[in-house]
Curated annotation (Swiss-Prot):
Recorded domain comment: The histidine box domains are involved in binding the catalytic metal ions.
Protein name: sn-1 acyl-lipid omega-3 desaturase (ferredoxin)
Transmembrane portions of the chain: 44-64, 67-87, 153-173, 206-226, 228-248
Catalytic activity annotation: a 1-[(9Z,12Z)-octadecdienoyl]-2-acyl-glycerolipid + 2 reduced [2Fe-2S]-[ferredoxin] + O2 + 2 H(+) = a 1-[(9Z,12Z,15Z)-octadectrienoyl]-2-acyl-glycerolipid + 2 oxidized [2Fe-2S]-[ferredoxin] + 2 H2O; a 1-[(6Z,9Z,12Z)-octadectrienoyl]-2-acyl-glycerolipid + 2 reduced [2Fe-2S]-[ferredoxin] + O2 + 2 H(+) = a 1-[(6Z,9Z,12Z,15Z)-octadectetraenoyl]-2-acyl-glycerolipid + 2 oxidized [2Fe-2S]-[ferredoxin] + 2 H2O
InterPro entries in UniProt: FA_desaturase_dom, Fatty_acid_desaturase
Chain positions of motif Histidine box-3: 291-295
Amino acid sequence: MRLEISSPQTKLPYPKTEELPFTLQELRNAIPADCFEPSVVRSLGYFFLDVGLIAGFYALAAYLDSWFFYPIFWLIQGTLFWSLFVVGHDCGHGSFSKSKTLNNWIGHLSHTPILVPYHGWRISHRTHHANTGNIDTDESWYPVSEQKYNQMAWYEKLLRFYLPLIAYPIYLFRRSPNRQGSHFMPGSPLFRPGEKAAVLTSTFALAAFVGFLGFLTWQFGWLFLLKFYVAPYLVFVVWLDLVTFLHHTEDNIPWYRGDDWYFLKGALSTIDRDYGFINPIHHDIGTHVAHHIFSNMPHYKLRRATEAIKPILGEYYRYSDEPIWQAFFKSYWACHFVPNQGSGVYYQSPSNGGYQKKP
C-alpha cells in the first residue's frame, strides 16, 4: 500500500491476502540487471567521501575549538558517522562489491571506529532480513505480545518503549526483548559454529579501538573524548535507532506468525520514508522496501529499482512522506505490543483502549 500520510490521524487499510498476487521472480525480472551490479569505484567513492568529510570536520572543530561550534559539529559529525555506518551496512550485505575480502576490510574500517562489531552485527542483521515481519523470529524492532509486554520488567519497558533512541549500544550486548546473546561473544546463539572466528576478529578490532580511545583520553583528558567522540557517537546512535525504528514500526503494518508468514510477505512489511535533504547524505537508506526484497543491491541503485517494481507492487508498496519526527512520535505512542494470538495483527499500546484490528 502506498501511504501518503499527511497527519497522525491518517489510517489506511492493508490488503491482507493469503498469497501475494506476484512472485519474487516477477519483481526481479522487472528490475534492470545492472541494478544488481555494484561498482567498486563508486562504492569506494562513497566510503572515501564519508571518511574525508569526517576528517575535515574534525580538523575544523580542532582549529576553531569553540563551544559555539561544538553543538553544530556534534550534529554534523554524528550524522556522518551514521552515513559511514550505511557504507559498512552495504559491505555486510555483499552489495559494496563482489569481493568478500574487500567487503570485510571496508566493513571493518567503516564500523569499528563507530563501535559496531562488523561481523557480529552483519550476522544478526542477516537474521533480521531473513525473518522480517515474523513476530517470533525477526531480530530487530519486532513486537512483543501483550502478555509478554505485561511481564516485562520496568527497565525493559523504559528502554524499549520510552527511550528507544538510545537502545542500540545495549542491543549489541543483550539483543532485544525475549532474545538471548551478545554480538561480541562467539558462543552467542546468534552465531553458527563456523562463524566464531569472524566474530572474534571484529570483537578484537573493536577492543583495540576502545584501547585507542582510552589512550587519547589518557593523553588529552575526558573533556577531549566528550567533545570529539562521545557527543558525535550519541548523535549517531540516535540516527541509527530512529531510522531503523521508523522502517519497521507503524500501526498500519501487519505482523505475522507461523505458516502465514513467508519471506516476500515479510519483506513488504516495511516502509520507504523521506528524510528530505538528509536522503543523499545517508545514502538513501530511506529507500527500504526494495532493499528488503533484494538486499544484495547497492544503495545507489535502490531508487531506480523501486521505480521498476512499484507498478507490480501496486497497493502493497508503502511510502510515507510524513515529517520524520511526527512519524516517530506517532509510532512511539501507538506501537507497544500485538495480540497474543493470530496472524496479520497490528500494533497497539496501553493508551488506546486495547486491541482493535485495523479495517
